[in-house]
Amino acid sequence: MESPPMFNSVEDECRYWKERSKQYHKEWTDVKQEYDEFVEQSREMEIEMDATLDQKQSIIKDLTAKLTMFERENESLKLKLESHGIDMSNMEKQLETVKKDRDTMKVYLRQLEQKNDDLERAHRILNESIENFEKMLDQAYEKNALLELEVDEKGLLQEKLQRLMDETRDLKQELNVKSRFTPVVNGTSVPTANDTNTVNSSMNSSASLPNGIVANGELVKHDNAVATRATSVSVNALNGSLVNRNEYNQQHSLKSDGDETEDVPREWSANAAATPLLPAIHTSGAGRTALLLAGCRVVWILQFSVIHKPQIRNPIT
C-alpha cells in the first residue's frame, strides 16, 4: 500500500481521499459482482456434480457385480494353490525359526522395559526432590524479599521519625519564643504558656472527676445539665467570634502587621460586646466553676488566635 502524498491544503486532501474512496468502492462492486458470478457458477457445478454422482453410483453397482464374478474365479484359483503345498511347508519351517527369534526379542524387550521403569522411577524421585528444593528456594527468596521490605520500611520510618522530631523541636522553640513575647491588648495581657498550662490543668482536673467538682474545699455533685449548657454557650460564642474574625480579616487584609495588631483588639472587643461569651446563668457552685473554666479557655483561644496568627506549616509528605 502506497503512502499518501503531501497536501497543500485541506481541500486537496479531501479531494484525494474522496477519489480513493470512489476507487475502492468501484473495486468493491467489481469484486462483489465476481463473487456473485462465482456463487452462481458454484451452484451450477453442484448440480452437475450431483448428476455425475448418480452416474458414478450406477457404475459402482456394475463393478460390484463384476467383483462377485471375480470372486468366483478366485475360488477356482484356490484349487490351483493346493499344488504349492510343498512350498508352504518350507515356508512354515522358516516361520518357526522367525518365531524363535521373536521370543528371544520379547525377553530382551521385557528386560529393557524393566530397566526403563527403574530409570523412570529414579527420574520421578529426582524431579520430586528438585521440586522440593525449588519450593524451599522460593520460600527463602520470599522471606528474603520480606526482610528487605521490612528493612526499607524501617529506614523510611526512621527518616520520618527524625523529621517529626526536628519539626517538634522547631515548634517547641517557636512556642517558647511566642510565650516570652506576648503583647498586651486593651490593658489586658494575653495568657502566656504558663497560664495556658494552668487553665488546661484545671480543665483536666475538673474533667478527671466525672461525679463531682472541688469547690470551696468541698466535693460537690456535678450538675450535668449546667455543664452541657455551659459547653453549648461556649461553642456558640466561639463560632460567632470566629465568623466575626473572618469578616475582619477579609476587610483588613491589606493592612500592615502593626495596624492589624492595634485594630484587632478593638474589633474583637466590639464583637465580644455584641455577643457575650458568658451570659449570666444562675447555677450552683459546680455549674459556675464549669462556666468559668470554659469561658476562660474560649477567651484565651480567641485572643491568641486573633493576635498571633500562627503560620501553617507544610505537612510532612
Curated annotation (Swiss-Prot):
It holds the Pfam family NUDE_C. Its main location: cytoplasm. Disruption phenotype: RNAi-mediated knockdown results in multipolar Class I dendritic arborizing neurons forming a bipolar morphology. Dendritic arborization is unaffected. GO terms for molecular function: microtubule binding. GO terms for biological process: axonogenesis; border follicle cell migration; cell division; cell migration; centrosome duplication; centrosome localization; chromosome segregation; dendrite morphogenesis. Residues 186-205 are annotated as: Disordered. InterPro entries: NUDE, NUDE_dom. It comes from the Eukaryota. It is found in: Cytoplasm, Cytoskeleton; Cytoplasm, Cytoskeleton, Microtubule organizing center, Centrosome; Cytoplasm, Cytoskeleton, Spindle. Residues 29-180 form a coiled coil. GO terms for cellular component: axon; centrosome; cytoplasm; dendrite; kinesin complex; kinetochore; microtubule; nuclear envelope. Keywords: Cell cycle, Cell division, Coiled coil, Cytoplasm, Cytoskeleton, Microtubule, Mitosis. Belongs to the nudE family. PANTHER family: NUCLEAR DISTRIBUTION PROTEIN NUDE HOMOLOG, NUCLEAR DISTRIBUTION PROTEIN NUDE HOMOLOG 1. Chaperone protein with functions in nuclear localization. Required for centrosome duplication and formation and function of the mitotic spindle. In postmitotic neurons, acts with nudC downstream of dar1 to ensure correct positioning of the nuclei in primary dendrites and as a consequence, is required for determining multipolar neuron morphology. This is Nuclear distribution protein nudE homolog. It comes from Drosophila melanogaster (Fruit fly).
